From Swiss-Prot:
InterPro entries on file: GDT_regulator, STKINASEGDT
Intrachain disulfide bonds: none
Name assigned to this protein: Growth-differentiation transition protein 7
GO biological process, one term: regulation of developmental process
Family, per entry: Belongs to the GDT family.
Lineage start: Eukaryota, Amoebozoa, Evosea, Eumycetozoa, Dictyostelia
Amino acid sequence: MIKTILIKLILLVIFCYHFLFAEEDVISTPPGYYDLIRHKRDPPITEYQSSQDTDLYYPDVCRNALRPLDYPWINEFAPIFFPGFNMGGFNSIFIPKNRSMIFRTPFQDSLVTLHVVCIEGTFIVEGNRFLFANTIIVLPGGRFESTTGIEFYDENDSGVSFYPDLPKDPSGFFPGILVLGGSISVVGKEPIVYRASRINDSSIEISPPVPEIIISPNPWDRVYKLVKIFTELYPLGFYCRYNTDEVGKILSLSSYLLYPFPPVSENDKIIRVLVETDRQQTVIPTNIYKREYATKGSIYITGGSNAYFKNIFFKNLGFTKNEPYNDTKLIFSPNDTNVVTDIIMGTNQKFRSSLYIESSKNVTIEGCAFVENDLTRSPLVFFDSNVKISNSLISSKSGSNIIALHGTDSIQSSNNSYLLEKIDLASWDVERNNNIDCGNQGNGIFSISPNINSNGDYFSGQQTAFNYYFIPNNSVNSNQDNSSLNSRPIEIIIKDSMFNPTASNGSLNKYFLNINTDGNKTISTYFTVRDLKTSHAINMNLNNSAIAFYNLKGGEGFKMEGNVERLDIIGSIINSNGSIKNISTSTTNIIDSYIYSSSSDIQPFNNQIYGSLITPYYYSDSNTLDKFEIKSILPNAPIQIVSGSLFNVSVQIQTLSSSVSIDNISCIFTSSVINTTVVQVNSNYSCILPLNITNEEGPLNLRVTLVNNTSPSSVSSDNYLYIIDFPEITVFNTYEFYSGWLMDNSNSSQQISFGGNSFKNGCNKVDSNCTISQNSKYSTVFSQLSITLPSNFKTKTHWMK
């Protein structure tokens, strides 16, 4: 009895397993198409795409694939190990789970043609020829490794004979690679991307030295040594022949067949060299490419996969045009969700880029090249993924070099070259919602959400190098119902990266950095930009958000445009006139920062709410920055003070060289309520001015000008070292406000008065913040100031800290 029950339970479990995980996932389609497999996306995708079908559908090409003999000792590919293998035809093979197999590419010369490779176990490709296939699918848990190139083909390619009459792929994934969870690693053994400098019109010096390419001894198979040169004028590159010196460091260039050979220009700021190996050469190929240009291929990675690409040229891939999307539509039966009754083939599939990566947090791209010669959207698209990309070349004809969509928390980009041939102005006329969230308008890196760390990258030809665009409603194309703007702080680190917006893209405004929330007022975000160095404009449209720049280096031509709720500039140097006059803010904080001004006639910032801290250190000569720096100023925050008080105002400087003397440095103090006062810098490198507050209420706009006074009898600010506007000092005569004082005697009155002024004990607590009035934050600067109160104030007090 118990045995019978157990058998029934086991059969029930088996039935449920097959019902839930096998049959239900197979979607039947109309005649002429592959059936489809429904692949459940990870939860993060459904989080961003909540209202529409979030499942992924791919053709059921693995069902009838040949499986190897069930012998564990078989670990190398041979046709005899796959029953039914057709030596003269197109074969699909399946590597089962817990099986590992090595495929050596000389089999390509032995009438072995692979059509589909399905990998649930491990499939390793070695050799010195291309892996020749139409489709590679890495199933969940599978592992694909290759140390040679991959050549995709389809029925449209010449030389592909007796192609079988196969069903159509409605999803548009193939020819190409589809990784559904597992790992993929494709690694070339030699570097293919090199930096170069010009020697003369036909010679360049590259780094590191290029290895000699072996030339076939067979004259019928002889291939010229070719390289492809990329510059600002030729962002898509041009082919030429080359010869090297003994160490492979100096390349002498010459024309190749009908390809023109333009001389290397003296004006080229960037020269990149791509060493491409093809299938006729006897060296190991380093391309992943579609064989001919009639149709393209793509690589689509999802499902939490691990991806590693090194020294690989992605060629003739990517077919998502820089036009409005037109995806394939599946018409499901109203009675059965596993039956598709009709398929409307799309003309512009989303995310069929050279490389599209989704829901994968461990992606590394190193020393690779991506070149898309057609008007495509982008070679690289990332969704909900973390990516490291370095020492690579990304060249596009249009669109953006990289598109980073929702959930991409981190992009680490270092020493890459991002080249764009032109901004496709035609795409600007297309309805905005069909394009703007997908980077159609000429960007280096177009980002919806990630933190970006860029170090030593070079951008050329774009309208905007870094473009953050947050859209309140972007469900039109990416199926995301909610705003792409999140409330988490976003950090952008841009260090030693350069931007060259070439003149070929017309008179459009060009920005090194653009951050735009598109009027989104529902969520506030705090942006941090670190180490940015540029001589180009940046633009911000952050109506309800704040942005802070740390260690900003703004060269000549730098400026800020747009509007932002709060702007912080901290520890920065801006070497351009009027660089921040065109930015509209509610609150501005400029702290420990130096701003160039050719004239000493500097207008202070106006229309700032109390709480803004604007203390730029203006300078007129960049040499001053190498000699002196401002160590501290007091007061260093806005203060409110009682008329009749006396306190010291100070500036402390620091020399940056032992040869610099402070003997002739003077400080000229001016304000609306005191006479001009000259104070010599003392032995402590400080200027101290005792300031007696008059009875006149209102703002006391205090300025100090540091001058190199070589003639003490004639002090002038014409050739100033630094000009500093102190934070706002507000003088009150008769006013009732919270004092910020606490009484030593707890029994003392809660309100004190002197000279007609009334003060309430303590401070006003608003949202855990201590304020001395309804619109001004309590400032700890008082504890740093030496203040003498009016003589009629007798009560013993101490400052709150």
